[in-house]
């Protein structure tokens, strides 16, 4: 009868709740600093530089669920679109709202980088990273890009820089009385400065000339930035039938032994 009772318990699949499990995973703090000047509407990347950059960055965010990630945008000015967070649903929703024209036009690379540094400098993470993406030359702001890089270095922040735009000229849309027209504009990216920012902070400079190369760049950064951290994961349900199964096996074994020894001689 005891074996039958235990079998009933097993079939009921008992579970425990409120359990914690320790695991090891990768996690760092990352701030994305993205140029949203009007030149990011150029269509050498599809559908344009900004949307291509948003798509690839969003995929990068989805691939790093345990990271604190924030978003800083810049043109002639800079502001924080989203502070560091592990709530990537909120981050991605705020990312969708990023468009040229929400701040004064221009390219303040130094200001954008300095803002990103201010958002990550107090982080206690083992690895602090900024991914700065721009398609132009610093022409606004009171902080020089190299000065901002020195500040980043002081706080132990590594900066990866990405220059986005094809070689030569790129088609740029503009509105006329006859609708949208396109004009080929020169692609001017201050690569020496972007390389210097990366070198100063221990990062790396990349050039993205199309969608595929931009995607590959983020993939490369993803591979380079892996830091093991300890994470406690909360599990609501945990199967507990194994101990009961062991008990059932033990009872059956005892019953078999009794049947072949003591109970064998009972008429």
Language model features with spans:
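Membrane-embedded segments
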Residues: 13-128, 143
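C-terminal signal-anchor/stop-transfer transmembrane helix together with its immediate cytosolic
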Residues: 1-22, 227-267
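Soluble extramembrane regions of membrane proteins in the secretory/endomembrane system
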Residues: 83, 94, 111, 115-119, ...
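Residue-level signature of catalytic and energy-coupling elements of molecular machines
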Residues: 7, 91, 116, 159, ...
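Solvent-exposed loop/turn segments at secondary-structure junctions
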Residues: 38-39, 76-80, 102, 136-139, ...
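VWA/integrin I-like adhesion module and closely mimicked acidic/polar interface patches used
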Residues: 104, 129, 136-200
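Short, hinge-like loop/turn segments at secondary-structure boundaries
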Residues: 87-90, 177-180, 223-226
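Juxtamembrane amphipathic/hinge helix adjacent to a transmembrane helix
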Residues: 29, 208-240
